[in-house]
Amino acid sequence: MTRIALISGFLTASLIAAGLAFAQGAPAESGVVATGSISAAQTAEAEAFIKTKHNKVRAVLRKPDTPQRAKQLTELLGEFLDYDRLARLSLDKEWDKRSNKELDKFVGLLRALVERQYQRNMESTLQYQVKWVGTEPIDEGVKVKSSARSVTKKRQPPITIDYSMHPVGKEWKVFDIFTDDVSLVKNYKRQFRRVINEEGWQGLIDRMEKKLNAENELI
């Protein structure tokens, strides 16, 4: 796998969960706790959380491809990826223009696409060694930094993969991923805005549905 393909995989794949249920009226909030300043203990907790989830996903992906494995993967991704937050940030101002029914449809499609692409990406990088290289505070919580290097192509430079996380209840959720300093959320936002401007809301939904039923990895 080339470096460009790997980066593309991370950008088109990585993020976010907790099956959404939209109530009547305003769209449901994600349950995010106001963070304020994040303590050293909380930072360490976030780092340990993503390390554990990451290792569990890799362990599941090393098992034979069965319906049980697919179920385990879906459950694991739902434990650390915040689909609600990702969807809101990716749609930006468009979020407030859409009905609960439209948002429910959108988030369901986004979740399915992310799950599929995350699995493909992780499977293709099982031979990469991941190192965790520190943290930094951000407004929403903490960014946990890592790098991935191929164990078979050691001359290939490592890829940096950073996880933006925030506390939700008593746990942590990932709401953005930076691959070589490129934001997944910003990448989605740019793509979604372009499609909506050119083809309208239904055009975006149609493209997402088509993508789910095809091998094409780009919107």
Q: Where are the language model's segments positioned?
A:
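Low-complexity, intrinsically disordered terminal/linker segments enriched in charged
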Residues: 176-219
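Solvent-exposed loop/turn segments at secondary-structure junctions
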Residues: 95, 112-113, 137, 150-152, ...
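Short beta-strand edge/turn micro-motifs at domain boundaries
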Residues: 158-186
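Early exported N-terminus immediately downstream of N-terminal targeting peptides
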Residues: 31-118
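Compositionally biased, proline/threonine/alanine/serine-rich low-complexity intrinsically disordered stretches
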Residues: 24-44, 154-156, 206, 213-219
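Bacterial N-terminal signal peptides
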Residues: 8-19
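Surface-exposed, charged secondary-structure patches
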Residues: 116-159, 211-219
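Positively charged n-region of N-terminal signal peptides that target proteins for export
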Residues: 1-5
